[in-house]
């Protein structure tokens, strides 16, 4: 098992009630797998699961990217501006 820190921003904090979550994950888990696990633990995230954006160690990451050991993950809603 691998430990990761998941930092949550904006509305994702509202859905979970947390700023940061430490999780144990299996080796080889992807961002998509982590999102699925987060929805199991925090069902209020389900409606926004597909739109959650991610970063690994402060760099944007795709859903297919495998999580490295002891990674810091950031999840945030899509950002738009005007």
Write out the residue ranges for each language-model feature.
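Ubiquitin-like/PB1-type beta-grasp interaction modules and other compact soluble beta-rich domains
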Residues: 1-81
């Amino acid at each position: 098992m691998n430990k990761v820190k998941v930092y949550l921003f904006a509305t994702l904090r509202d859905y979970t009630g947390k700023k940061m979550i430490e999780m144990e994950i299996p080796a080889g888990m992807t961002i998509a797998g982590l999102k699925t696990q987060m929805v199991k633990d925090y069902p209020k995230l389900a409606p926004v699961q597909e739109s959650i954006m991610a970063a690994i160690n402060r760099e944007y990451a795709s859903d297919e990217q495998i999580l490295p050991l002891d990674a810091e993950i950031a999840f945030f809603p899509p950002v738009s501006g005007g």
